[in-house]
C-alpha cells in the first residue's frame, strides 16, 4: 500500500530502516497520512500497531490527506468526510488508550471535519506532535485563556481585524467575543478562502498573503 501511494518501490525498505534507526538510539516522532478507502480502517490500525513495536518510535500523528485544487494527471483520491473522520478518531483514541496514552493522536483537522470537540490540552501530553497539527487548538485555547486572565479588564476602544483559515474561523470568532468584552475592543474575524491552493485547503497555515490582500481590500 505504501508503494502504491508513493509510487516508489524503495518504500518497502522503510520498516527495516526505521528499526535500524531505533537500534542506534534514534527517537522518532512519526506521521501517518490517511487516504480514505486506501489506508484507513484496518490498514491504519495495523500501521499504528506496527509502529508501536518499533524501537525508538515515540509517537504517531494521524493526519488526513490534503488535496489542493491542482491535481491534473494525478490519481483520484477521496477526501475525508465527517463519518470517516469520526471513525478514525474512534479508532485512534481507542488505540491510544490501549497503549496507555501519549502514543498516537489524530490531528486537529480530523476533529474539525468530524464536528467533534477537540480534547483538552492534558490529552496531548508534551505536545510532541504539535508541528503536525496535533493539539494546536487545545494549546491555543489554553494560552488564550491564560493570557486573557493575566491581562485584566481594559477599555482600549480600538478595532482589530483577525485573519485565519476557514477551518479555524468558527473557533476564533467564538473566542474573539471574549477578547472584545475583556479588553473593550471591536473585533472582526475574516475567514480567508484559499484560492491559491484550492478551496478544499482550509487550514490557517496554508493561507497566502495574496489571498489575504485580495479578500481584505
Model-derived regions: residue spans:
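Radical SAM enzyme core and accessory elements
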Residues: 115-217
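Active-site-facing alpha/beta catalytic cores
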Residues: 1, 101-111, 116-124
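Glycine-rich tight-turn/loop motif centered on a GG-T
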Residues: 7, 76-81
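Short, glycine-rich nucleotide/cofactor-binding loops
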Residues: 5, 36, 165
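A conditional alpha-helix N-cap/helix-loop micro-motif detector
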Residues: 10-11, 41, 85, 205, ...
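Flexible loop/turn segments at secondary-structure boundaries
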Residues: 1, 37-39, 68-71, 112-114, ...
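Conserved C-terminal portion of the radical SAM core fold
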Residues: 15-74, 83-109
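Hydrophobic, small-residue-rich alpha-helical packing segments that form membrane-like cores
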Residues: 1-11
Amino acid at each position: 500500500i505504501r508503494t502504491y501511494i508513493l509510487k516508489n518501490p524503495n518504500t518497502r525498505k522503510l520498516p527495516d530502516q526505521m528499526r535500524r534507526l531505533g537500534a542506534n538510539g534514534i527517537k522518532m516522532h512519526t506521521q501517518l497520512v490517511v487516504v480514505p478507502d486506501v489506508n484507513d480502517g484496518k490498514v491504519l490500525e495495523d500501521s499504528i500497531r506496527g509502529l508501536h513495536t518499533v524501537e525508538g518510535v515515540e509517537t504517531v500523528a494521524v493526519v488526513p490527506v490534503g488535496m489542493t485544487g491542482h491535481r491534473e494527471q494525478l490519481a483520484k483520491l477521496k477526501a475525508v468526510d465527517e463519518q470517516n473522520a469520526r471513525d478514525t478518531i474512534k479508532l485512534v483514541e481507542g488505540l491510544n488508550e490501549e497503549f496507555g496514552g501519549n502514543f498516537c493522536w489524530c490531528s486537529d483537522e480530523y476533529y474539525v471535519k468530524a464536528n467533534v470537540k477537540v480534547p483538552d490540552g492534558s490529552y496531548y501530553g508534551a505536545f510532541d506532535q504539535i508541528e503536525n497539527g496535533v493539539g494546536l487548538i487545545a494549546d491555543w485555547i489554553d494560552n488564550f485563556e491564560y493570557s486573557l486572565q493575566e491581562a485584566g479588564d481594559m477599555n482600549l476602544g480600538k478595532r482589530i481585524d483577525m485573519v485565519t483559515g476557514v477551518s479555524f474561523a468558527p473557533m476564533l470568532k467564538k473566542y474573539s467575543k471574549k477578547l472584545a468584552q475583556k479588553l473593550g475592543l471591536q473585533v472582526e474575524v475574516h475567514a480567508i478562502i484559499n484560492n491559491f491552493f484550492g478551496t478544499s485547503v482550509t487550514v490557517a497555515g496554508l493561507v497566502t498573503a495574496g489571498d489575504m490582500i485580495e479578500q481584505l481590500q
